[in-house]
Amino acid sequence: MTIWVDADACPNVIKEILYRAAERMQLPLILVANQALRVPPSRFIRTLRVAAGFDVADNEIVRQCEAGDLVITADIPLAAEVLEKGAAALNPRGERYSDATIRERLTMRDFMDTLRASGVQTGGPNTLSPRDRQHFAAELDKWWLESQRKK
């Protein structure tokens, strides 16, 4: 089991939660990005730098993740691809993607893209709140407990 992070867009506060969790759970945590990242010294935490470019980090995560892994991403198409491989996917707000919800999320994403392309101002996501951080940490722990039961 490995935790993969789509690190270019992952908020720093979520990375901090993941650093602590990797140590506590003694699980590999791999942050994939197209830029250099600073991470705390740990035998469990490493970075994987990829070339800059559209979806390069996403494609590398899809290529390397396996069933049973966890992928942290707000990228809905990436989440859909890793779910197909049998990995779990969690966004930085603590929402766990599932086979049951991913189609709806993809449809909504495509609809919002269409609105933006036609000139409609859709705004961005709200700032990550303390409640979002707590929800993320709770869902991360829930995933960990579920994965331990499956062993």
UniProtKB/Swiss-Prot annotation:
Signal peptide: none annotated. InterPro entries: UPF0178. PANTHER family: UPF0178 PROTEIN YAII. NCBIfam families: PRK00124.1. Belongs to the UPF0178 family. HAMAP family: UPF0178. This is UPF0178 protein YaiI. It comes from Salmonella typhimurium (strain LT2 / SGSC1412 / ATCC 700720).
